[in-house]
Structures are given as C-alpha cells and as structure tokens.
C-alpha cells in the first residue's frame, strides 16, 4: 500500500520533490504545482524523477464549480478540468479529481437546495461525459470527490453516477469522511466505510484520509480534525483499502503544518501496524 501527502520544500526540482516524499515515508504524491498539459519536457522530468524513487502521482486536483450558475464561469471551469484530465493522462497521474459542483452563487463548494436534485445529477453526468470524451484518456480516470452537501454524498449515489456516466474512464475518488454528514453517520462511521467499499471498491482510484469530530453544541457541527482525534474509524478505512486488489493510495490532506502532517502520518502508520498493513510494499 501507499501513503502520501503534501511536502513542504522550497524547490520545483522534480528530483528534490520526489526525494522529499520518500524522506517522509510517502510513496504517493499530489500533482506538483506549475504543470500544464502539453509541457512535455517538464512533465517527463517529473514522471522520470518520481518513477525513479517509486512515488506514484495519486491525483491531479482541479477545484472549481462545474455547476456554477454563471454560464461563462461554468464553461471556463469545464475547460480547466478538461485540461486537468489531459495533464493527468500525460503525467501518469491515477486520476483528475474535482467536486461535481452545486448551484450556490456565493461559495464554489457551498450548499444549495437544488444540489441533490435530478437536475444536479443530470448535469454531473453530462459534465463527466463531456470531460472524458474531450480527452479520451487511456489510463487516467476522471473522478468526483464525495461531498457532504452535494452529489455524490453517499456510496449509493456515487454508484448511481458511475452507472449513469457509463464511461470506463470514470472512476471513484473516495473521501469517506465527506460522507459523514449526520449524527447517524457519525456514530456509525464503520457502516459508512463498509458500504463504500462494498459498492464502490473496484472503481476506487485514490482515497483521502482524515478524521472528523462532532462538536458539543445544540446544532449539528461536524469538523475535520487531525487523524486520531475524531470519531472516524480509521482502522476500518485502512483495512478496506488494503483489502482491494489494486491497492489505491491513501492521501493525507487539509492540515495546517508539517508538524500536523507528521502527527497524522504517525497515527495512520500506528493503526496500520496494529492491523498488519504495511505501506512499504
């Protein structure tokens, strides 16, 4: 299995970046910044350096709103994701990932009453097909990240999308913490995780790994926290990934400093050791 996360180095040298990942025990990486599709020499340098050090590129993130209410913005966002998938294909990244999007005009990843509508589902399908058909990737997948207040918000809804998009190049980016969007889910994260792997396992390309806590308050407040400080069943999550034949990478994210990433990494490694899972092979 492979664990990955951001590295904090002041260099854009591919060799330095690749070694920085291995120095942290990472064998998976996010796409380095500054790359664009068609930059053949730079892309080759990154591919060669990362392959030399046995570090795979887990995902190429393009974060925008593919359902932006502004039509001009939506078209520009769609073009950016098409370029992102083209880059992922050239780079050898496992996937290009974005959110499916929503109808909020105030926040690109915000809630909206129509985010779970049939119109949203149909647009998510249309956008995925448009992106994939424009690039026609042979290896990289296009994926949506699971989100708590827009589709796909659950394993079942993600499976519906996989079936509706009906493209071999459409895969699953698994972030099961984002499917913890109610007290019911929070108090049985194990069941949420189990459903994700049962319904989506064969389609999973890359996974985010973090934790979540429900705060003491009258209203429901769910907050991302450092791995090991919340209620997410990391043990079951790591075990679920390890149980997949193709062993998709696990990627740490959304932490504030190298020190926090180190603490999260050590916790995940400790959990993995307890269940007999190795990130070294």
Identify the function of each model-found stretch.
Residues 1-4, 58-67, 103-111:
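N-terminal small/glycine-rich loop or linker at the start of catalytic domains
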Residues 29, 60, 126-226, 231, ...:
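Acidic/histidine-rich catalytic cores of soluble enzymes
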Residues 2-7, 29-31, 57-62, 96-98, ...:
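Hydrophobic faces of well-ordered beta-strands that scaffold small-molecule active sites
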């Amino acid at each position: 299995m492979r664990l990955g996360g951001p590295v904090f180095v002041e260099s854009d040298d591919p060799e330095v970046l690749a070694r920085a990942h291995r120095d942290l025990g990472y064998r998976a990486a996010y796409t380095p910044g500054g790359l664009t599709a068609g930059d053949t020499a730079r892309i080759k340098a990154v591919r060669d350096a990362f392959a030399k050090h046995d570090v795979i590129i887990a995902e190429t993130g393009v974060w925008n709103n593919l359902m932006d209410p502004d039509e001009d913005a939506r078209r520009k966002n769609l073009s950016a994701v098409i370029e992102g998938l083209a880059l992922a294909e050239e780079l050898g990244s496992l996937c290009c990932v974005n959110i499916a999007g929503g109808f909020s005009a105030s926040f690109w990843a915000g809630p909206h009453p129509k985010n779970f509508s049939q119109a949203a589902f149909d647009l998510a399908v249309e956008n995925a097909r448009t992106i994939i058909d424009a690039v026609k990737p042979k290896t990289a997948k296009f994926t949506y990240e699971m989100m708590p207040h827009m589709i796909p918000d659950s394993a079942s809804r993600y499976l519906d999308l996989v079936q509706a998009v009906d493209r071999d190049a459409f895969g699953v980016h698994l972030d099961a913490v984002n499917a913890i969007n109610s007290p019911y889910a929070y108090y049985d994260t194990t069941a949420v995780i189990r459903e994700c792997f049962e319904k989506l396992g064969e389609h999973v390309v890359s996974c985010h790994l973090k934790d979540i806590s429900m705060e003491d308050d009258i209203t429901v407040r769910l907050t991302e926290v450092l791995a090991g400080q919340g209620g997410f069943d990391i043990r079951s999550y790591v075990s679920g990934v390890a149980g997949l034949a193709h062993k998709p990478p696990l990627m740490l994210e959304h932490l504030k400093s190298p020190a926090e990433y180190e603490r999260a990494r050590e916790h995940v490694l400790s959990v993995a050791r307890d269940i007999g899972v190795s990130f070294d092979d």
